[in-house]
Design a protein with these regions (language model features):
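Non-transmembrane, aqueous-exposed alpha-helical and coiled segments at domain scale
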Residues: 1-281
Length: 281
């Protein structure tokens, strides 16, 4: 059994919040640079070059990539041999989010009641936390700030087995086409297939934590990722939704078992700033 004081979790989460909002992952930067070289639309190329200038400035000055620093989504993998001491784990995570957003001068975008009061919490808490227990004595944390422009354009469809792979392709492409400029393309497309209604949605979100360029380990789904990326880019939505050949930088699929009578499919979109930061304790 390994003991970890939750104060270490708090400080780690605070740093990840700031890092994820300031520094774009290298894989994302490489994809945007490559897209700027191959984009067919002159306006689209100009937009992509502006995105490059933006992430270079944010890294140089340690300032947010975007004013929408999102709700904080935390994916936790906790080794079953870990024992947390010094407080409650989730409270420690929320404290880390608060510290990161206050100390990092990040916009606070969380309201407590979604319908009536809609009062801002003032520190971007609470975080949205997904926890998985794994073998070992380590704790892995992935922090993904998620803005609402892209989040609002996600979709879920309870497909039937008879819809098959063609039904999945149509749903994904239709979702991207309907989203248009709203998710700030070029986007990353997270697709969750299987499970039930809520698991498909979580899988789609989790798919966005995978580094751009990393394919699903199953070659069938890896091939589907490539095919979907090609289909999405043929929509012509383009950078900022103003037309062009670069609508998406990547498509990531996660899948799991499901009921014999169903094939749920969820799509979660990231904007061109596929923000993430991770650490292990």
């Amino acid at each position: 059994m390994r003991e970890i004081n939750v104060s270490e979790v708090t400080s780690t989460v605070a740093k990840l919040c700031m890092d994820s909002c300031y520094y774009l992952p290298e894989a994302v930067k490489a994809k945007i640079r490559a897209a700027a070289e191959t984009e067919e639309s002159p306006l689209g190329k100009e937009i992509l070059n502006t995105l490059i200038e933006n992430f270079e400035l944010s890294q140089k000055k340690a300032v947010p990539l975007c004013q929408d620093t999102g709700l904080t989504v935390v994916f936790l993998e906790i080794g079953q041999e870990v024992h947390f001491v010094g407080g409650y784990l989730y409270e420690a995570i929320h404290a880390g989010v608060s510290k990161g957003y206050v100390d990092g001068y990040l916009r606070k975008s969380s309201v407590g009641d979604p319908v009536f009061d809609r009062k801002n919490s003032g520190d971007n808490t609470p975080a949205i936390i997904h926890t998985k227990i794994v073998p070992g004595d380590k704790v892995k944390m992935i922090v993904c700030p998620k803005g609402c422009g892209s989040e609002n354009m996600g979709a879920l469809k309870m497909l039937k087995p008879a819809d098959g792979v063609e039904g999945i392709k149509k749903f994904v492409v239709d979702t991207v086409r309907a989203a248009g400029p709203n998710p700030c393309p070029p986007i990353t497309v997270g697709v969750g297939i299987g499970g039930n209604m809520e698991q498909a949605a979580i899988l789609a979100k989790y798919a966005l934590t995978r580094q751009l360029g990393e394919h699903n380990a199953d070659p069938r789904y890896a091939a589907l990722e490539d095919e979907l990326l090609e289909l999405v880019n043929k929509t012509g939505v383009g950078p900022s939704g103003l037309g062009g050949s670069t609508t998406a930088l990547g498509v990531n699929i996660e899948f799991t078992h499901t009921h014999i009578g169903g094939m749920p499919c969820a799509v979660n979109l990231n904007c061109h700033q596929a923000r993430r930061a991770e650490a292990e304790i």
